[in-house]
């Protein structure tokens, strides 16, 4: 799946915003901090029915059995209006970024795309990254969502961006 120019621009803005918000203090362990608990509310109408949702992104780290740090990024879609958002009308993406212990900017490590739980029809995206060489000092994730307004496959612009960090 390719990102639209609008998503790419919004993702770049999210990188800059998160870079300015994330404290770079060194710590012995990782802990999760939600900078924004939910993305902005979005609504749309399909075939005369109104739907609304927000997205929530989070990043967490665990230690693998080999002692490596593994970062997990998730972005979930939450229905706001009491109707299930049609799964064919929404795409969700999660992007996991990392910053080197040597400094510099955040770098995109991994991207996860829309997954639909077949039992609950919950819409989410997930991805992970294992720090093989103990080089990453902090991580953050950005969640993106797009909606389709009609039966045509032209997707609207980016809806919500939400950032969580870990350092």
Per-region residue spans from a language model:
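N-terminal prepro-regions of secreted/extracellular proteins
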Residues: 1-70
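Low-complexity repeat regions of mature extracellularly deployed or surface/particle-associated proteins
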Residues: 59-63, 75-77, 141-144
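Short, solvent-exposed, Trp/other aromatic-anchored flexible loops in extracytoplasmic proteins
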Residues: 110-149
